[in-house]
Amino acid sequence: MSNVQTGAERMPHDLSHLGFLAGQIGRLITISTTPVIAGDSFEMDAVGALRLSPLRRGLAIDSTVDIFTFYVPHRHVYGERWIKFMKDGVNATPLPTVNTTSYIDHAAFLGTINPDTNKIPKHLFQGYLNIYNNYFKAPWMPDRTEANPNELNEDDARYGFRCCHLKNIWTAPLPPETELSRRMTTSTTSIDIMGLQAAYANLHTDQERDYFMQRYRDVISSFGGKTSYDADNRPLLVMRSNFWASGYDVDGTDQTSLGQFSGRVQQTYKHSVPRFFVPEHGTMFTLALVRFPPTATKEIQYLNAKGALTYTDIAGDPALYGNLPPREISMKDVFRSGDSSKKFKIAEGQWYRYAPSYVSPVYHLLEGFPFIQEPPSGDLQERVLIRHHDYDHCFQSVQLLQWNSQVKFNVTVYRNLPTTRDSIMTS
């Protein structure tokens, strides 16, 4: 009778580990990855402290921190190749890799040290791309489709991809292809009332898809249905934690002059993932994103910047605001010294749905506060995405980048795996 071991009892495995992390404002960085096997049950309690690098001045604005855990099946990355790989077993062709550069930190955005081979598994890189494309870019932005990490610029490879500002009138515009008008042609001088209604219906369904249903799952939900994350190879968001990182001012930071002070930010946090059943092999990604609210020194309330106001501008007439097409405005309409050639589109009356922050002019010549000093420039995508260099002047030192965190990931995975003793004592 054969004594070859062909199975194993389902047992808890302690995969707890530490993370010593550093990142930049507005960039999505991976802070932990755990490979998982079909049939696993994964649970995690992450406990840590997040710090901003020492500020040059007193703490002016709290930063908001988001921590996410996603599940990405390998099948979403490798497709039919993964299915064949599992069917072929030990005779299967090895899975492909992707190429990195030779720098040690050019895979840091994936939460790993770059190996000497300058190659990493494809599912790490493509899994990150899938997460970013589905959850962190504006739907109207093109997908990131780089085939290898060595195609990324240095900032993306080291610190992660740029994410959008928190929403306001100029950081969350309508899609650039938004129509400001639509004409209906008729063949005669008379108007077909039924045809007019049909044209309205076509316009409505087009607008719904342009604004609210750019992804398949959104279209299906509009019919009252629901798609699984498998339907469009979407990473599954398992848990999100959000908190504000607060701090305090420290007086007497200089030995010779106790009048100096510096802002310090240290916020403890907990990110808990309840037990999650893993249906097939994949990777659990945990990512972090730290952002300041977009507070600009030269931002102006739209009505204050426009000058002579029309009835439509100021009346707030529901009949008009509910039926007028979107309005195209420029950066000059919401910023002093804004570029009038940089256009974007907003819903009519959006200035009554949002209030800009105000920064006294006495701050304008001072560096060290987390304010956006100049109106964002570049194309629409460039203006919407956060530029971490805008905040470099806030910090005394960026040796540990703009924020850092020390965290204990308490991870337990229940899986069918032979014990270490069983693996040693072969046959």
From Swiss-Prot:
GO terms for molecular function: structural molecule activity. GO terms for biological process: symbiont entry into host cell. Keywords: Capsid protein, T=1 icosahedral capsid protein, Viral genome ejection through host cell envelope, Viral penetration into host cytoplasm, Virion, Virus entry into host cell. The keyword Protein biosynthesis does not apply. Pfam families: Phage_F. It is found in: Virion. Coiled coil: none annotated. It comes from the Viruses. Transmembrane segments: none annotated. The keyword Translocase does not apply. GO terms for cellular component: T=1 icosahedral viral capsid. Belongs to the microviridae F protein family. Assembles to form an icosahedral capsid with a T=1 symmetry, about 30 nm in diameter, and consisting of 60 capsid proteins F. Upon virus binding to host cell, one of the spikes dissociates from the capsid and the virus interacts with LPS through the exposed EF loops on the F proteins. After the genome had been ejected, the channel formed by the F proteins at the unique fivefold axis remains open. Pentamerizes and interacts with H protein, G and B pentamers to form 12S pre-assembly complex. By binding with protein D, induces joining of twelve 12S complex to form the procapsid. The procapsid has an external scaffold made of 240 copies of protein D, 60 copies of the internally located B protein, and contains 60 copies of each of the viral structural proteins F and G. Upon genome packaging, interacts with protein J. The mature virion is composed of 60 copies each of the F, G, and J proteins, and 12 copies of the H protein. This is Capsid protein F.
